[in-house]
From Swiss-Prot:
The keyword Cytoplasm applies. CDD domains: YlxS_C. Required for maturation of 30S ribosomal subunits. This is Ribosome maturation factor RimP. The lineage of its organism: Bacteria, Bacillati, Bacillota, Clostridia, Eubacteriales.
């Protein structure tokens, strides 16, 4: 099964559980590192930071449904974590939530002679984000290789 299809299937199973426990499903990833597969579930909540107890609670509940539904053929490790201080920004809603914050954006190829820009996120929609660094740059979302918050929350 293709990775994107696998993650969609896992999200359908996991998201209702995460939300039922009053968390936000921030991001899912399925990766192979050093010969081992990992399903990583990043959770967040509005009013407070994520604790180890929060991760354990979600891990137990998600583990139960994944064991029953068994959407992943390979053996894997399940990890539940917070997105962290320098969290990745993957979706339009992530970019919109952090307008006004400092970000680092890396490009696919180069854009106006640059491979990346660090600055304040000024605008975001599904087609472009605007970052004010050394200069103001309007970045097409398809040119974004990766983006994350910088600095302190």
């Amino acid at each position: 099964m293709r990775k994107d299809m696998l993650l969609e299937k896992v999200e359908v199973l996991v998201k209702p559980i995460v939300e039922e426990l009053s968390y936000e499903l921030y991001y899912l990833e399925y990766v192979k590192e050093n010969g081992e597969y990992y399903l990583r579930i990043y959770i967040d909540k509005e009013e407070d930071s994520i604790s180890l107890n929060d991760c354990e609670k979600v891990s137990r509940r998600v583990s139960e449904i994944l064991d029953v539904e068994d959407p992943i053929e390979d053996s894997y490790y399940l990890e539940v974590s917070s997105p962290g201080l320098n969290r990745g920004l993957y979706k339009e809603e992530h970019f919109k939530k952090f307008i006004g914050r400092e970000v680092l954006v890396r490009f696919n190829g180069s854009l106006e002679g640059m491979k990346k820009i660090q600055g304040i996120l000024k605008e975001a929609d599904n087609e472009f984000i605007t970052v004010q660094g050394e200069k103001k740059l309007k970045i097409p979302t398809e040119k974004i290789k990766g983006a994350n918050l910088e600095g302190e929350i």
